[in-house]
Every structure is written in C-alpha cells, then in structure tokens.
Amino acid sequence: MGFQRARSAEQRQERRETIMAAAAGMLGEMPVAALTLSELSRRVGLAKSNVLRYFESREEVLLEVLMRSATACIVELDEAWAAEVLGDAALPERIEAFAAVYARVAAAHPDLLDLVSAQASVLERNVSTEAIVRFKRAALAGLDTLSSVITRAIPELGDDAPVVGSLMLTLSGAVYAQAEQSRLCESAYLVDPALAVFRVELVPALQSAVATVIAGTLAR
C-alpha cells in the first residue's frame, strides 16, 4: 500500500506517534549520532519527504522523544524516592540518598541521557523557532515537576529547587558523555594504567555530582 496522507487530526497524531515510537526504539539500538532520517523513514515505511510532513526534521522528532522519556523518568524518580522512606533522616543522609536514587534511575535510561547530552549542541540546531518554543515550554513544565520531586526530598532547598534541577539535567548529559567516552578509551588505560585517572563510571560520578550540587547550593 502506498503512502496515504492523514486526513484528520487524530490520524495525523497517530502517524506522529508511530514515527516517535520508531525513533525511541532505534535509540535502544544506536546512539543519537547514528540515528538518521533515512533509517527512521525506512523503519516506519515512509519516504523521507512523507516523514517530514509530520515533523520538520530528525531533530524535532528527537526533541519530542526526549521530553516524553524525561517525563516518564521523572515519574520513576518520584516513585523510587518515595520507596526510600527517608523523610525524617538528617540532611546529609537525605542528600546522599537522593543523589544515589537519581543516579540509579537516570543510568537506567541511557537513551535519555544520550538525548540530553545532544540537546543543546545538536537537537536544538535544526528546528524552527516554533519547535523550540514548544520544546522549551514542555521542558519548563518538566522542570517544574522535577523541582517538586527535589523539594519533597530536600525541602531545605526552597526556591533553589528549580536551579538545582536544571543543573542536575545538564550534569546528567555531561557525565553520560564522559562515561561513554571513558568506556571507549578503556584500551588506552590498559596500555598506560596511569591514564585510568580519567576513567568515569556513570553511576558513582553522577551521584557525586548531584550530591555536590545540592550541598553546594545549600552552603551558598
């Protein structure tokens, strides 16, 4: 069957959902850098020109996938923290525990971390102003939800929770990128063990970064 254009808003949304689902599935198989519009089109059985009827670019597809994945991850973080039952613990203990939970949950979503690491440098570069506005508005709503989770864990942060949340997301992408590069450099560490000082392990590095941001913000 040849391409049939969606005739209603519902059909158009269904086609968009199909494209986003295919992109999300591909991210489980390959890094963001390897995901091309050509391969995405092949996976959904459409010509590239037809995919571009629903999204203006590969980058817009991935921004949409990023936000959906982030939303689900924040819900997972909230549930994981609630299961810790540490509301009455001392502040230092809660900081370390929350950082550990965040690092564990985030590390379970490498596709999301890859998207976050590419957001500013790649994904926001080939989209229209309208697409950026939609993404930023959705990101603002997501940050508000994340801030609520952070506040439940560390109420002492008060109005600084959104700032901490934003820094946590930025650090997540950066630490992931370093951890991936470190993994690829493992052979160099074997040649010269002294270079292993540059090895970055995702979970402990992310936990340390998040705990430092929270503690540092409270100390300012």
Locate each region found by the language model:
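N-terminal hydrophobic signal/anchor transmembrane helix of membrane proteins
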Residues: 73, 92-114, 196-220
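Basic, helix-initiating cap at the start of DNA-binding domains
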Residues: 1-31, 38-42, 85-87
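Amphipathic alpha-helical segments used for helix-helix packing
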Residues: 106-130, 183-188
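Alpha-helical structural segments
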Residues: 14, 18-25, 43, 60-83, ...
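C-terminal peripheral helix-coil segments that are non-catalytic and often amphipathic
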Residues: 144-152, 156, 174-220
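Hydrophobic alpha-helical connector segments
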Residues: 64, 79-112, 164-168
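Amphipathic alpha-helical packing segments from all-alpha helical-bundle domains
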Residues: 123-154, 162, 204
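Helix-turn-helix
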Residues: 33-60, 64
